[in-house]
Amino acid sequence: MFDIGVNLTSSQFAKDRDDVVARAFAAGVKGMLLTGTNIHESQQALKLARRYPHCWSTAGVHPHDSSQWSPASEDAIIALANQPEVVAIGECGLDFNRNFSTPQEQERAFQAQLQIAAELQIPIFMHCRDAHERFLVLLDPWLDSLPGAILHCFTGSRQQMQACVDRGLYIGITGWVCDERRGLELRELLPFIPAEKLLIETDAPYLLPRDLTPKPTSRRNEPAYLPHILERIALWRGEDPQWLAAMTDANARTLFEVVF
């Protein structure tokens, strides 16, 4: 199993990061992609990817942090992307749910990172919330130039999922699907995601699966819970968990060109 979305730089992991990584591998996780959400976090993610085996990182600016975007951001991302441990540009995209940065700032940063990914021929790791139509408008001109693209933490509708798959995007599914209320629509569309386009992730320390038993004492999510998410996804897709683990591992190897 490969976790394509771990926020290992989070302060929630500051006291026991080594233990968190050890628990993940002990649980059967074979590799992890550590996400960068701004320049500083991307630099930290790279350091952690160098520190732990079978870990890689992304370099980018999240829509929440898009107000920080500057020409220096572009230079920093390019410098990071030239490191072998950095296998994707992002996390980038649009988030019109909270608008911590204005839509204009988000679009500017997203388009700049699409250009970087296309020019460097490196996959792009994307976020989209409450911005589907505008997201596709900005993404579409770049699709032919990008070597690969993943929409991580997908929580949209079946129609939105199909629009992404039709464009060749990989779809990242988190423990959100384990929520008996909020995750129901996502659960119902799982069988319609092509197996060759499915990736799995925890988005730790966020999105702790609500159906873990026994219930954890902490609300902090960990990559060690990835096997639980995989088993639930396999159940709702009607597939064997071992087969699905092998399939999603193969997808991660194909998209990110990683060896684990």
Swiss-Prot record:
Top-level taxon of origin: Bacteria
Subcellular location, principal: cytoplasm
SUPFAM superfamilies in the record: Metallo-dependent hydrolases
Entry keywords, A to Z: Cytoplasm, Exonuclease, Hydrolase, Magnesium, Metal-binding, Nuclease
GO cellular component: cytoplasm
EC number from the UniProt entry: 3.1.11.-, 3.1.13.-
Record localization: Cytoplasm
Cofactor or coenzyme needed: Mg(2+)
GO function terms (MF aspect): 3'-5'-RNA exonuclease activity; magnesium ion binding; single-stranded DNA 3'-5' DNA exonuclease activity
Binding residues for a divalent metal cation: E91, H127, H152
InterPro entries per the UniProt record, alphabetical: DNase_TatD-rel_CS, Exonuc_TatD, Metal_Hydrolase, TatD-like, TatD-type_Hydrolase
Keyword Membrane set for record: no
Function: 3'-5' exonuclease that prefers single-stranded DNA and RNA. May play a role in the H(2)O(2)-induced DNA damage repair.
Subunit annotation: Monomer.
Alphabetized NCBIfam families for the sequence: PRK10425.1 (NF007745)
Family: Belongs to the metallo-dependent hydrolases superfamily. TatD-type hydrolase family. TatD subfamily.
Designated name of the protein: 3'-5' ssDNA/RNA exonuclease TatD
Protein's organism: Salmonella typhimurium (strain LT2 / SGSC1412 / ATCC 700720)
Gene field: tatD
